[in-house]
From Swiss-Prot:
Keyword Secreted: no
Residues in Beta/gamma crystallin 'Greek key' domain copies: 17-56, 57-101, 107-148, 149-191
Stated family: Belongs to the beta/gamma-crystallin family.
Positions of region (C-terminal arm): 193-205
Quaternary structure and partners: Homo/heterodimer, or complexes of higher-order. The structure of beta-crystallin oligomers seems to be stabilized through interactions between the N-terminal arms.
Organism the protein comes from: Homo sapiens (Human)
Gene3D superfamilies in UniProt: Crystallins
Domains (record comment): Has a two-domain beta-structure, folded into four very similar Greek key motifs.
Identification of the protein by name: Beta-crystallin B2
Disulphide-bonded residues: none
Length: 205
C-alpha cells in the first residue's frame, strides 16, 4: 500500500459520508445505509449490489471483500445499474466500500514511466487529463507520486477501463495502486463538494 495517506491536521474530511446500497437495479428492493468502511457488504444483509445512491461522498468500492480486486470510485449522485459505476464492464460484483478522504484543495500528481520514480515523467497540477497521448506522454505508468489531492487514474483514455484510486503518497510500482499492468492513460481529480463549500469550487459548464 502507498504511504502517507493520513489526513493533514486541520483539514476536513467528508462531512458525514453516506451511501445507500440497494439489492436491485433502479433503487429497488432491500437496502442498507453505510456511514463508514464496510469490509464485507454481505455481512450487512445485502446479498448483491444492484444500484447505489451516494448522498455524501466520495467513496471507493471494491470487487472483493476486504477492499480487494477491481476498484470503483463513487461520487455524490445516482448509480442505477452496475454498469454505471464500472467503465471496464468486467464485473458486476461490489463487495466492500470505504469513504475517500479529501484533504486538499490543491492537486498535484507525478506519473513515472518506470518503477521507483524513474524514467520519463509527467507532472499534472490542478487539472484533469482525458488523454496522456494528447499531452505527448505515450509511456507506461509504473510508479506514481501524489503530492496533494486525491485522484483516480484510468486504464484507457476518456476515463475508461479499470479505475485506480490514487491518494496522497508514493506508489513505487503499479501493483501498489492495484494495476495488473503499468497502463494508465487518463487521470482526473476527486473533489469533495463539501470541501469547496466556501466558493473555491467552480463547476465547469
Amino acid at each position: 500500500m502507498a504511504s502517507d495517506h493520513q489526513t493533514q491536521a486541520g483539514k476536513p474530511q467528508s462531512l458525514n459520508p453516506k451511501i445507500i446500497i440497494f439489492e436491485q437495479e433502479n433503487f429497488q428492493g432491500h437496502s442498507h445505509e453505510l456511514n463508514g468502511p464496510c469490509p464485507n457488504l454481505k455481512e450487512t444483509g445485502v446479498e448483491k449490489a444492484g444500484s447505489v445512491l451516494v448522498q455524501a461522498g466520495p467513496w471507493v468500492g471494491y470487487e472483493q471483500a476486504n477492499c480487494k480486486g477491481e476498484q470503483f470510485v463513487f461520487e455524490k449522485g445516482e448509480y442505477p445499474r452496475w454498469d454505471s459505476w464500472t467503465s471496464s464492464r468486467r464485473t458486476d460484483s461490489l463487495s466492500s466500500l470505504r469513504p475517500i478522504k479529501v484533504d486538499s484543495q490543491e492537486h498535484k500528481i507525478i506519473l513515472y514511466e518506470n518503477p521507483n520514480f524513474t524514467g520519463k515523467k509527467m507532472e499534472i497540477i490542478d487539472d484533469d487529463v482525458p488523454s496522456f497521448h494528447a499531452h505527448g506522454y505515450q509511456e507506461k505508468v509504473s510508479s506514481v507520486r501524489v503530492q496533494s489531492g486525491t485522484w483516480v487514474g484510468y486504464q484507457y483514455p476518456g476515463y475508461r477501463g479499470l479505475q485506480y484510486l490514487l491518494e496522497k503518497g508514493d506508489y513505487k510500482d503499479s501493483s501498489d495502486f492495484g494495476a495488473p499492468h503499468p497502463q494508465v492513460q487518463s487521470v482526473r481529480r476527486i473533489r469533495d463538494m463539501q470541501w469547496h463549500q466556501r466558493g473555491a469550487f467552480h463547476p465547469s459548464n
